[in-house]
């Protein structure tokens, strides 16, 4: 838990005793947390999926893999995800065993079936994915959609244009699969998925308009003067983080020619 992670990172366990389990976002290296995941799954983990490679999401995957086995094959579970992009921070480097592509499905079969469909959603990071649990109409949103705050878009690994486009993509996916609930990587479950996504996009665009207004009013200003105007509704202690997302907004505005 902390400023960047809120109440901590949510790990999700998908499956039943007869199908085995998929673990999504095993989190940082934390032996006690790994023990809890193994206990909850009886160690029968068929796949590990990381929504992205930030240090609060993916480093625990290797330890969980080493300490788990697929009960039907005796093999350790493969780590699934997308490799880090060229702009990732050193602490966010990640090379999965299985590289997931948009539309891929990771499936558990038994008396019931559990299907996770991959939705590639760059924006928070270049390698971010979300997951649709098809049978249950649930969206596992990683850090793209949070409960309690908006996610940080930290250039260059983070990209505001990609983030907004990915929100549109998630909106369409939720409509197509009748998704009502979003399971974020930080915070509690969100209901009314379509409204959440629409409101989040509107909030981002409203913030971008405030950033543009701050620059238009003071073209010779700097990040410190602009953040005080564009984020005047945000506690000052959070302005250093806000400046990272503000830079992503400025990059987006410059790309569209709205600011010099």
Protein language model annotation of sequence segments:
Residues 14, 25, 52, 100, ...:
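Divalent metal-coordination and catalytic microenvironments
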Residues 138, 160-218:
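Divalent-metal (often Zn2+) His-rich catalytic cores of metallo-beta-lactamase-fold enzymes
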Residues 30-31, 53-60, 86-88, 126-128, ...:
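Active-site environment of divalent metal-dependent phosphoester hydrolases
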Residues 23-26, 46-54, 80-83, 120-123, ...:
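Active-site neighborhood of phospho(di)ester-bond hydrolases with catalytic His/Asp-centered motifs
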Residues 13, 105-134, 138:
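Core dinuclear metal-dependent hydrolase active-site scaffold
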Residues 2-7, 26-117:
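Active-site HxH/HxHxD metal-binding segment of metal-dependent hydrolases
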Residues 213-260:
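C-terminal regulatory/interaction regions
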Residues 1-41, 130-142, 147:
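Conserved beta-strand hairpin/beta-sheet module of binuclear metal-dependent hydrolase folds
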